[in-house]
Amino acid sequence: RPILTAGGAQFITPLSVSALAHETCYTDLFSLTAKGEMGHLRLARETDLVVIAPASADLLAKMANGIADDLASTTPLATDRPVLIAPAMNTQMWQAAATRLNVARLEADGVQRIGPADGALAENESGPGRMAEPADILAAIEAHFSQPGPLAGRRALVTSGPTIEAIDPVRYIANRSSGKQGHA
């Protein structure tokens, strides 16, 4: 489910994000509350992987220091799922000691990182700080989900259909199972 920060909304509208994602775009921490539920917790729990792209220096600092003052910073703090960040910022911001320490802390906490790349930046400069290409981010997401799980290499036999148990040579007990679930 996409979450758009106030800064991100300066570049693209929530409506555009919703249209591209075919999902509701969330922008406000408190607009999620329905029937007394904690919306940010719901978002954090119903995901399999939290992907933050682009991850600004501000958001990285909030994540590294446990600051949760908006939906984008609260969700990764509230999740127990893996987090993947794709940093994007000015070269000087990327190379700043504070940013490097924040990224090191996040990586030590198990946050995965892709990028940033070297290349053209928004301020007509070139250098490290460019967000990884969307195709590379997608490849990292696919790699995450294609990791072998606890059942990798195991084989299973699935049987389906009715169960018939003989009582004697003439009578039996059976159920009306069609087997459709087993064939699905």
Region locations from a protein language model:
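G-domain G4 guanine-recognition motif of GTPases
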Residues: 88
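A cross-family phosphate/adenosyl-ligand binding-site feature
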Residues: 1-83, 91-179, 183
